[in-house]
UniProtKB/Swiss-Prot annotation:
Name this protein carries in UniProt: Phosphoribosyl-AMP cyclohydrolase
Annotated source species: Rhodococcus erythropolis (strain PR4 / NBRC 100887)
Subunit structure: Homodimer.
Role summary: Catalyzes the hydrolysis of the adenine ring of phosphoribosyl-AMP.
Record InterPro entries: PRA-CH, PRib_AMP_CycHydrolase_dom, PRib_AMP_CycHydrolase_sf
Entry's family note: Belongs to the PRA-CH family.
UniProtKB keywords: Amino-acid biosynthesis, Cytoplasm, Histidine biosynthesis, Hydrolase, Magnesium, Metal-binding, Zinc
Length: 115
């Protein structure tokens, strides 16, 4: 698969050719996770509507839930104003975090909401 050249032209990548991808749950608005994508991962996501990312440590693509069953159905993909990050609006089945929690952002609260 290859990414539409019009979309590719809008992306700003880091030195490794990657950009960040934020997954947000459609029904709750919860931010679920942040991962990396490159053009191929984005093209696969747009084609299949499955959250597809690039693993920097394994140097390979991975589809969310492919081994765990905790899948992401992608409803929308939005590009941020700088072109260096995408937002995926998803339906999350099961845990989004590899630790087994719903979101990767529920472990350490560094600043709590004021009461």
């Amino acid at each position: 698969m290859s990414l539409d050249p019009a979309i590719a032209a809008k992306l700003k990548r880091n030195d490794a050719g990657l950009f960040s991808a934020v997954a947000q749950e459609k029904s709750t608005g919860d931010v679920l996770m942040v991962a990396w994508m490159d053009d191929e991962a984005l093209a696969r996501t747009l084609e299949t509507r499955k959250g597809t990312y690039y693993s920097r440590s394994r140097q390979q693509y991975w589809v969310k839930g492919e081994t765990s069953g905790h899948t992401q159905y992608v409803h929308e993909v939005r590009l941020d104003c700088d072109g260096d990050s995408v937002l995926l609006i998803v339906d999350q089945e099961g845990a989004a975090c590899h630790t087994g929690t719903h979101t990767c952002f529920d472990t350490d609260v560094l600043l709590a909401a004021e009461q």
